[in-house]
């Protein structure tokens, strides 16, 4: 189906040369940190598929920009995972619902990596091998505060100081 990141992350030109020589689509993963990276790689012909990881591109806003660049250039996108907790998985599920995410993603059930997670309900895989996007507001998951408290080692409170002139520092 694809070769995912077959060369070094900073080797965009050789990815382009490889993609010209083979029929199998090259999928860039670690090479894509922004929509500009995606635009550049697509323009060079370095890939025919892009993997987006929220943590790598810096969050939803940039992930949406990468998805838009790919969609405008008919480049399929899929969501990669990085062993996230249920909170991170919830973000990945939300991202994977965007129109350009046309390939199966790398989001799995919480239980694959965590005996007990910090979010509820658990992310589960259906008998068909799919994940269902929650229908609740927001990300559709709640935090298991009892679990978080049991894992908490220390709590700190950060207070923003206000100067005599009323400016915060």
Residue ranges of model-derived segments:
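Shared catalytic-loop signature of beta/alpha-barrel
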Residues: 2, 8-27, 32-130
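Residue-level recognition of conserved structural "scaffold" positions that shape functional pockets
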Residues: 65, 87, 136, 145-147
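Ubiquitous "structural anchor" signal
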Residues: 94, 100, 137, 146-148
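C-terminal accessory segments
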Residues: 127-139, 145
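Extended hydrophobic packing segments that form well-structured cores
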Residues: 139-169
């Amino acid at each position: 189906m694809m070769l995912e990141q077959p060369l070094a992350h900073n080797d965009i030109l050789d990815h382009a040369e490889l993609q010209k020589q083979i029929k199998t689509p090259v999928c860039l993963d670690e090479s894509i940190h922004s929509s500009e990276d995606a635009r550049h790689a697509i323009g060079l012909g370095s890939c025919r598929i892009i993997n987006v990881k929220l943590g790598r591109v810096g969050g939803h806003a940039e992930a949406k920009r990468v998805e838009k660049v790919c969609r405008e250039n008919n480049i399929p996108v899929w969501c990669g995972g990085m062993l996230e907790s249920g909170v991170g998985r919830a973000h990945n599920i939300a991202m994977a619902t965007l129109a350009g995410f046309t390939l199966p993603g790398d989001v799995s059930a919480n239980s694959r990596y965590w005996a007990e997670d910090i979010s509820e309900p658990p992310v589960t895989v259906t008998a068909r091998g799919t994940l269902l996007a929650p229908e609740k507001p927001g990300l559709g998951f709640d935090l298991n505060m009892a679990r978080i408290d049991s894992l908490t080692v220390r709590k700190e409170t950060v207070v923003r100081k206000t100067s005599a002139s009323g400016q915060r520092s």
